[in-house]
């Protein structure tokens, strides 16, 4: 088959062809009229100026002299009459694409034949749009192809087209930058064949956005990633790719999020500012969507959110200077939310009390203010920016964000000083310890932990044993759990762990003796008041390690001769710090192993929380190896299994209505679960109980207002109505066993449900 026989024209709409043809015909008619009139005038001039030559033309060339411009107008009118008669358009003959045709196209494309490349790309376009309807006709628009042919086309194009087009366009064999594409767009090869690259990228994007099979989408994204740099030539297509990749990254499972992120990261590195700002904004918003959670969180979901956070941190490390502006805006938003919660929470001075008496915020407004802060979205955003600042602590661009972020985290920890929110406080302490370690800045964390230990809920006698509590999978606990021994044990052990980590960071400082003095005094006082022996032993062990480290530093400090403001202070105990030889550092290692064993016993998933969570580089390399192993096999992914059928499935109105009814039933069952919570007697606990109910209904930030201002003790009213209804039914019906079972019981709607719906 010759090169010209294999050529397949790219699709052009009928309207465009007709308009182009009509405009060309009009131009030709106008031009021919002008030429005819000019020619007739020239002949008249010739007859007047040179009659002898005119006679010669009459004898030799009569046709030239017999020319008349009126004849042209007559011919034109007759042509219009003929054109006004409608002609029957010939029907298109749809030819099926066979395996022999595909094999010949593939071989020709490997040899660099342009006709074969066009044909295989046209077949790829037909495969990507297979099963879609065109206009009002229900018949398929494109040629028929079998499943084996479709698989062959998809695999060949996705695996080899980037290399083939690079050779055709004289582009670098791998990678490239924006400047390379800018130079390439001036060449003749790009002007001739550049639209082939666009055809390949457009249809691949259609596959990514339309397919529902995650394995096929991941394979497509992984293969198209090699051509990412060529999107610099198509800005509109680049924006669509960024939007599609953010969607697959945030909503996908398996290998799809990782492959999508690697594609997005390559775009930001290779193209720079063209897509970096859009990607930084979009990936943060997509991360927020995944953080909409209820009261508690599972281990698998926590691990997934940590992976997404690592991706965000990696993308913000690409260009710290551009990332600073976006990070500053987002951290400022968190500060504004915290400021609103602090101002509405309650007065602190007599002057504030007088001002509050004049303008009293409603109970609903107060609940809404600090629910925005004690929400999973807000907490995970703080952890995200903590990891970003700690990961770029050596960069001067992001280092100034450490101070405002520390202020926000400290304010969140002190917002509601209640034992029910100890999980949030412990998370905040972990974040502050990470910032202090990364930046080398002292942060007064010990006061937050010592205030926890001195609360009456941890020092008093528990009411029950209770179940084991994982403080890092919840953001608050109920009132019954606070009074259990398991909760006391989890809080005290976690506080000791974080306090030891904080002091171990500064156990090599020349001022450690003075720094740890107040902490030592308060721990000794707590040791006297605590009643449980196991808690007393735990605190005594920590006190012993603090004293040993203070003596260790004092002995080393006695042998030096420089003053405290001498620059040589920075080198004090530098060798011991690198070796981690202080007593507190060794004690922290044993505590870390113990806390890890405790977490493993609580969680079957063994999710590590904090700085040691899911390492990005290790996961990246493992996923890359798995993807390469899958790509080695030719038939690893069968596109024909789902591609030929999934696009044809359309939901009927009945199915949609059934789905809406099913979702409505699910919402009702969730509300039933929320109503089983017992309201507390104290005013503060009543607010927190209602907050727990609203958190289960909706975990978004800010929390939507689901309660009513006139909501007062709905359970008692509901029970009274049900008793009255049962009494009336018993009076009307005789007391028979059969009658009570046959008749349907009338359900009394709960007032709280009625108000919500």
From Swiss-Prot:
Feature: compositional bias, Basic and acidic residues: 78-89, 619-628, 644-655
Query: Is Transcription set as a keyword in this record?
Result: no
* Pfam families xrefs: Noc2
- Report the subcellular localization: Nucleus
Q: Where is the composition biased (Acidic residues)?
A: 1-28, 67-77, 668-713
The keyword Transport is assigned to this record:
no
- InterPro entries from the entry? Noc2
Cellular component GO terms held in the UniProt record:
Noc1p-Noc2p complex; Noc2p-Noc3p complex; nucleolus; nucleoplasm
> Which terms under GO biological process does the entry name?
ribosomal large subunit biogenesis
Gene Ontology terms for molecular function: protein homodimerization activity
- Tell me where on the tree of life, at the top rank, the source sits: Eukaryota
Give the PANTHER family listed for this entry.
Answer: NUCLEOLAR COMPLEX 2 AND RAD4-RELATED (PTHR12687), NUCLEOLAR COMPLEX PROTEIN 2 HOMOLOG (PTHR12687:SF4)
The UniProt entry's sequence similarity note says: Belongs to the NOC2 family.
Protein name from the UniProt record: Nucleolar complex protein 2 homolog
């Amino acid at each position: 088959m010759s090169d010209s026989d294999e050529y397949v024209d790219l699709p052009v709409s009928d309207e465009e062809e007709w308009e182009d043809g009509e405009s060309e015909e009009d131009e030709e008619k106008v031009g021919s009229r002008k030429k005819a009139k000019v020619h007739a005038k020239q002949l008249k001039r010739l007859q007047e100026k040179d009659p002898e030559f005119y006679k010669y033309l009459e004898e030799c060339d009569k046709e030239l002299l017999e020319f008349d411009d009126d004849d042209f107008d007559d011919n034109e009118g007759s042509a219009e009459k003929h054109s006004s008669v409608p002609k029957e358009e010939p029907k298109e003959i749809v030819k099926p694409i066979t395996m022999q045709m595909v094999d010949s196209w593939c071989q020709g494309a490997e040899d660099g034949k342009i006709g074969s490349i066009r044909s295989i790309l046209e077949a790829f376009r037909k495969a990507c749009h297979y099963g879609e309807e065109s206009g009002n006709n229900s018949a398929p628009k494109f040629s028929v192809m079998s499943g084996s042919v479709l698989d062959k086309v998809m695999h060949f194009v996705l695996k080899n087209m980037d290399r083939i087009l690079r050779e055709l366009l004289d582009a670098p064999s791998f990678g490239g930058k924006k400047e390379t594409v800018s130079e390439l767009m001036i060449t003749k090869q790009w002007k001739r064949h550049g639209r082939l690259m666009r055809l390949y990228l457009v249809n691949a994007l259609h596959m990514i956005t339309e397919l529902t099979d995650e394995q096929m989408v991941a394979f497509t994204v992984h293969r198209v990633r090699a051509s990412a740099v060529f999107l610099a030539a198509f800005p509109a297509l680049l924006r669509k790719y960024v939007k599609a990749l953010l969607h697959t990254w945030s909503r996908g499972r398996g290998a799809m999020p990782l492959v999508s992120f690697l594609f997005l990261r390559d775009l930001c590195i290779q193209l720079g500012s063209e897509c970096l700002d859009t990607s930084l904004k979009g990936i943060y918003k997509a991360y927020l969507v995944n953080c909409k959670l209820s009261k508690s969180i599972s281990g698998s979901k926590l691990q997934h959110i940590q992976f997404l956070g690592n991706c965000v941190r990696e993308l913000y490390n690409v260009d710290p200077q551009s990332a600073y502006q976006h990070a500053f805006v987002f951290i400022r938003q968190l500060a504004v939310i915290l400021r609103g919660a602090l101002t509405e929470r309650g007065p602190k001075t007599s002057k504030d009390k007088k001002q509050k008496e004049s303008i009293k915020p409603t109970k609903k407004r107060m609940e809404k203010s600090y629910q925005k802060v004690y929400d999973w979205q807000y907490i995970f955003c703080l952890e995200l920016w903590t990891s970003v600042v700690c990961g770029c602590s050596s960069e001067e661009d992001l280092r100034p964000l450490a101070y405002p972020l520390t202020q926000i985290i400290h304010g969140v920890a002190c917002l509601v000083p209640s034992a029910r929110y100890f999980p949030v406080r412990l998370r905040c302490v972990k974040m502050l310890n990470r910032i202090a370690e990364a930046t080398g800045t002292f942060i007064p964390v010990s006061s937050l932990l010592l205030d926890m230990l001195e609360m009456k809920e941890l020092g008093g006698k528990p009411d029950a044993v209770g179940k084991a509590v994982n403080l890092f999978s919840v953001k608050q606990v109920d009132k019954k759990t606070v009074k259990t021994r398991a909760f006391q044990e989890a809080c005290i052990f976690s506080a000791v762990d974080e306090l030891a980590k904080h002091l171990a960071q500064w156990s090599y400082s020349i001022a450690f003796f003075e720094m740890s003095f107040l902490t030592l005094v308060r721990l000794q006082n707590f040791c006297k008041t605590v009643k449980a022996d196991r808690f007393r032993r735990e605190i005594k062990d920590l006190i012993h390690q603090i004293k040993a480290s203070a003596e260790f530093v004092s002995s080393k400090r006695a042998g030096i001769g420089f003053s405290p403001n001498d620059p040589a202070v920075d080198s004090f105990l530098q060798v011991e710090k690198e070796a981690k030889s202080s007593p507190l550092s060794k004690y922290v290692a044993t505590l870390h192993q113990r806390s890890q064993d405790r977490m493993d016993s609580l969680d079957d998933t063994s999710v590590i929380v904090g700085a040691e969570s899911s390492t990005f580089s290790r996961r990246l390399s493992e996923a890359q190896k798995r993807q390469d192993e899958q790509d080695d096999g030719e038939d690893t992914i069968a596109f024909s299994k789902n591609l030929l059928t999934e696009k044809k499935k359309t939901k009927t109105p009945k199915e949609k209505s059934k789905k809406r009814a099913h979702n409505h039933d699910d919402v009702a069952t969730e509300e039933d679960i929320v109503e089983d919570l017992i309201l507390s007697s104290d005013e503060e606990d009543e607010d927190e109980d209602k907050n727990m109910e609203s958190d289960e209904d909706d975990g978004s930030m800010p929390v939507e207002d689901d309660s009513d201002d006139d909501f007062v003790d709905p359970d008692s009213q509901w029970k009274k109505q049900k008793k009255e209804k049962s009494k009336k039914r018993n009076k009307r019906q005789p007391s028979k066993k059969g009658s009570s079972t046959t008749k349907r019981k009338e359900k009394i709607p709960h007032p709280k449900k009625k108000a919500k719906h």
